[in-house]
Swiss-Prot record:
Subunit (UniProt): NDH-1 is composed of 14 different subunits. Subunits NuoA, H, J, K, L, M, N constitute the membrane sector of the complex.
Family designation: Belongs to the complex I 23 kDa subunit family.
GO BP term (any one): aerobic respiration
Organism, as annotated: Azoarcus sp. (strain BH72)
Name this protein carries in UniProt: NADH-quinone oxidoreductase subunit I
Function: NDH-1 shuttles electrons from NADH, via FMN and iron-sulfur (Fe-S) centers, to quinones in the respiratory chain. The immediate electron acceptor for the enzyme in this species is believed to be ubiquinone. Couples the redox reaction to proton translocation (for every two electrons transferred, four hydrogen ions are translocated across the cytoplasmic membrane), and thus conserves the redox energy in a proton gradient.
PROSITE patterns named among the record's database cross-references: 4FE4S_FER_1 (PS00198), 4FE4S_FER_2 (PS51379)
Binding-site list for [4Fe-4S] cluster 2: C72, C101, C104, C107
4Fe-4S ferredoxin-type domain residues: 52-82, 92-121
One MF annotation (Gene Ontology) recorded for this entry: 4 iron, 4 sulfur cluster binding
Alphabetical keyword list: 4Fe-4S, Cell inner membrane, Cell membrane, Iron, Iron-sulfur, Membrane, Metal-binding, NAD, Quinone, Repeat, Translocase, Ubiquinone
Chief location category: membrane
Length: 161
C-alpha cells in the first residue's frame, strides 16, 4: 500500500464516490411500474396461455398430426385422434397440463396448420392442481375469446415466419 492509496483511504475516497453515484440516481425519473394498475406493453411474440384456433367456417384447425406432442420437451401435451366419416383425422382429446408446460413455444412452431398458439393472456390462476389442466374444449374457448388478437399478432409476425 503506497502513500497515495493510504491518503485516499484516509479521506474515504471510495465512500465519496459511492455517495456521488447514489446522489446522481436519487433524483432521476422512477421507472417502476405499479403492476395491477399500470401495464407495460406486450410483444406480439409473448408466450402466454395456450389456445386452439378454428377456421373462419367454425371447423377446428387441429389435424391431429401430433407434432406438438412429439416436440414438447416437458411432455405436457396429450393428444388422441379419430377418423371422421369423410376420411379426415381430428382430435378427440387435446389436453395441456400447464403445471408441466415451460412455455417454450415449440408446439406453436411445429404446428403445420397454426392450430395451437400461445396467446398474450398471462393473468390466469388455479386454486387446485386440476384447474391448470386444460382440455380441448377449454383451449377452443380461449381461442374463440381471443381470436382477433391472435390473428392480428400472426399478421404482424408473418414476415418473420
Amino acid at each position: 500500500m503506497g502513500a497515495k492509496d493510504y491518503i485516499g483511504s484516509l479521506f474515504l475516497k471510495e465512500l465519496v464516490k459511492g455517495m456521488a453515484l447514489t446522489g446522481r440516481h436519487f433524483f432521476a425519473r422512477k421507472i417502476t411500474v405499479q403492476f395491477p394498475e399500470e401495464k407495460t406493453p406486450q410483444s406480439a411474440r409473448f408466450r402466454g396461455l395456450h389456445a386452439l384456433r378454428r377456421y373462419p367456417n367454425g371447423e377446428e384447425r387441429c389435424i391431429a398430426c401430433k407434432l406438438c406432442e412429439a416436440i414438447c420437451p416437458a411432455m405436457a401435451i396429450t393428444i388422441e385422434s379419430e377418423q371422421r366419416e369423410d376420411g379426415s383425422r381430428r382430435t378427440s382429446r387435446y389436453d395441456i397440463d400447464l403445471t408441466k408446460c415451460i412455455f417454450c413455444g415449440f408446439c406453436e412452431e411445429a404446428c403445420p396448420v397454426d392450430a395451437v398458439v400461445e396467446t398474450r393472456v398471462f393473468e390466469y390462476h388455479g386454486e387446485q392442481r386440476g384447474d391448470l389442466y386444460y382440455t380441448k374444449q377449454m383451449l377452443l374457448a380461449v381461442g374463440d375469446r381471443h381470436e382477433q388478437q391472435i390473428a392480428a399478432d400472426r399478421e404482424q409476425e408473418a414476415k418473420f415466419r
